[in-house]
Curated annotation (Swiss-Prot):
It holds the Pfam family PCRF. PANTHER family: LD18447P. One of its GO terms (cellular component) is cytoplasm. It is found in: Cytoplasm. This is Peptide chain release factor 1. Disulfide bonds: none annotated. Peptide chain release factor 1 directs the termination of translation in response to the peptide chain termination codons UAG and UAA. GO terms for molecular function: translation release factor activity, codon specific. InterPro entries: PCRF, Pep_chain_release_fac_I, Pep_chain_release_fac_I_sf, Prokaryotic/Mito_RF, RF-1. Keywords: Cytoplasm, Methylation, Protein biosynthesis.
Length: 360
């Protein structure tokens, strides 16, 4: 471990001790908000304290085993214990390094999933539908809830565009690396010559704005249009202009919702999406500025970036952001078994973040 990382660990250990003292003070206990915030910070630092204590014990075990080597009768046993202690120390060093990676405060939150057909006409819309079902099935496996906010079905299946809210603990942390352009290579059902076509769809993963997020939307900046819904609700919604489209004039961001029966409910949902979109745009602007001075291989969230290819004839899926990340398990992945991909992407992100910490 580099001296820089070791100093960061020591500073966090000192902060945990300070928090322990603060949480015992009567004035802090009496202040519910402060007590809650400090308790949350203390809980986040607890794994580091536990790993540091384990490291101290492993170092003591190593020293004791090295001391045993002076006795010829115990040398063989000592060598075994030395090897075990060294292996344990190596594991703990890796664990501590990963614990230093800053946690994204949005990781536990919900998200908006947006899938749009790109180049490829009807085939692109069908592929967009495949991607949406893949994420919906993955969400179902995690016990999350998927609520379709708006959709525009393709003429021959799939979606020209579909927007859904994904509700579940840890949803954003799992899916946040999915933003970008997804490419498919396959023979369309309408292709009589058996030729492989290439189509694309874009995916956007936008964290839902927290209620405490500091963003003020001036009502004067909004243009609100109503229209007849073509979504859920049967004939009732088609008789009234219950659907809402909101345009944020300064940025040109447009959101709409037509899934609820009442105009008021649709407006509330649309405003939540607008807030999330504006916050996400600001985050991406800040990330772009920071990326000028540091490398971000995974997780930039750039929706123009081609991130993955789905090759149906070969049953292959290749993620272009991680060298060597190719899996020949396309049917299962499309059925919602995304963890083999997502875990590799998360690990790569941690490695990148750790490299930045070491450099700093």
């Amino acid at each position: 471990m580099t001296p820089t990382l070791r100093r960061k660990l020591e500073a966090l250990a000192e902060r945990r001790e300070e928090l322990e003292r603060l949480l015992a003070e009567p004035d802090v206990v009496a202040d519910n908000t402060r007590f809650r915030d400090l308790s949350r910070e203390f809980a986040q630092l607890e794994p580091i304290a536990t790993a540091l204590a384990d490291e101290t014990r492993a170092k003591a075990d190593l020293a004791a085993a090295e001391g045993m080597r002076a006795d010829p009768d115990l040398r063989e046993l000592a060598d075994e214990e030395i090897a075990a202690a060294q292996a344990r120390l190596q594991e703990l060093e890796q664990e501590l390094a990963l614990l230093l990676v800053p946690r994204d405060p949005r990781d536990d939150g919900n998200l908006f999933l947006e899938v749009r057909a790109g180049t490829g006409g009807d085939e692109a819309a069908i592929f967009a539908g495949d991607l949406f079902r893949m994420y919906a099935r993955y969400a179902e496996r995690q016990g999350w809830k998927v609520e379709i906010e708006s959709d525009n079905p393709g003429e021959h299946g799939g979606y020209k565009e579909v927007v859904a809210r994904v509700v579940g603990r840890g949803a954003f942390s799992r899916l946040k690396f999915e933003s970008g352009t997804h490419r498919v290579q396959r023979v369309p059902a309408t292709e009589s010559q058996g030729r492989i076509h290439t189509s694309a769809a874009t995916v956007a993963i936008i964290p839902e704005a927290d209620e405490v997020d500091d963003i003020v939307i001036n009502p004067a900046d909004l243009r609100v249009d109503t229209f007849r819904s073509s979504g859920a609700g049967g004939q009732h919604v088609n008789k009234t202009e219950s659907a809402i489209r909101i345009t944020h004039v300064p940025t040109g961001v447009v959101v709409e919702c037509q899934t609820e029966r009442s105009q008021h409910a649709n407006r509330d949902k649309a405003m939540k999406r607008l807030k999330a979109q504006l916050l996400d745009a600001e985050r991406q602007r800040q990330d772009a500025a920071q990326a000028e001075s540091r490398r971000l291989q995974v997780g930039s969230g750039d929706r123009s970036q081609r991130i993955r290819t789905y090759n149906f004839p070969q049953g292959r899926i290749t993620d272009h952001r991680v060298e060597g990340l190719t899996l020949y398990d396309l049917p299962n992945i499309l059925a919602g078994d995304l963890d083999p991909l997502l875990q590799r992407l998360s690990h790569e992100h941690q490695v990148d973040a750790l490299a930045q910490l070491s450099a700093g």
